[in-house]
Amino acid sequence: MAVIFSLLLSIFGLFNLFGLNHDLFFRQFIYLILGFLGYYFLKSIGPHFFRINSNFFYWFFIAVLLITFIVGLEVRGSKRWLNFYFFNFQGSEFFKVFFILFLSEILTKKNLLFNSFLNFIKIFLCFLLPFLIIFKQPDLGNAMIYFFIFITLIMFSTVPKKYLGYLIGLVLLLVPIGWFVMKDYQRDRILSFINPHLDTQGTAYNMIQAVITIGSGMFFGRGLGLSTQSRLFFLPENTTDFAFASLVEQFGFFGGFFVLLFFTLIFIYIAKKTIRFYYEKTEDGQKNFLYCLGILTYFVSQTIINLGMNMGIMPITGITLPFISYGGSSVMAVLLGLALLP
């Protein structure tokens, strides 16, 4: 069921790209074909192989993140991609799925003494390592997705809740330090979100233009390829970060409603699986529960953050909208996550 709604969302995304950039449309079309072929291939294999090798995949992608940080393709001051000429590979997107798989395995081990604070520290370090690498790329948006996934899985695992309290307290203490560790443009984006009038032609420009673009679409939109804000480049990043704003300009609130509806139906599908596995008290049932919960957290948080950016109700963090934003790594990672659902 989820793959059907994913396909419908992908069609919306393709039409949106067709109205903006034909070259990107054809590239995304190829990415989607590869992604859906990969989805059915992985479905035929099943999640068991990836579960028993989750430790290997965790360290493999840690190595990928480190290599990306050192020799990755730099775009606007960020090193998030490995350039393979025909494809820019963003390891942090794919790693989300394997990070969830890794946590769902380690948090359900019967021989792991969660009453030991040392074991909790080990689990925390398994989160902190990729979080810091991604944060330093810098990619604050994806780093926050990893944080939400980790907090959610810890909350619903058998880890004593007092440790969760320690973790939340530590986060609150580190937030002021994090402010000074951020890049200047990241701090400016947050300040511009709080008060857009501080710099309407600078850091707040993208957010303001996104809101204008959504409003200009009205109910039925301007029509395919007839958008002005997007096609005339008043709206930057109109095929990636702000693809939803571009889509609403072309297809109106009517089109935007169906996009939100399809996302909601995917979330409901995964949530039903999550609830079903919650009541299975076997070790495999709890692994499946945590994996489904992690994927749900990943999809919901990424969708809400991107939509919030487009509507001007959340700071800009460079998060893509699954199936709608242009990008091979993003769409393939989401399909990977769906393919490994039990």
Task: Walk through the language-model features, giving the residues of each.
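Proline- and acidic/polar-enriched loop/turn elements at helix boundaries
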Residues: 21, 166, 225-226, 260, ...
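TM-adjacent membrane-interface loops and short helices in multi-pass inner/ER membrane proteins
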Residues: 192, 196-240, 251-255
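Phosphate/oxyanion-binding loops and surfaces in catalytic or ligand/nucleic-acid-binding neighborhoods
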Residues: 14, 217, 338
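Glycine/serine-rich anion-binding loops at beta->alpha junctions
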Residues: 86-95, 136-138, 142, 218, ...
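Interfacial segments of multi-pass membrane proteins
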Residues: 144, 150-163, 228-255, 319-337
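Nucleotide phosphate-binding site architecture
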Residues: 108, 220, 314
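Hydrophobic alpha-helical transmembrane segments of multi-pass inner membrane proteins, especially
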Residues: 3-11, 15-206, 245-311
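A juxtamembrane structural motif centered on a specific transmembrane helix
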Residues: 17, 287, 301-342
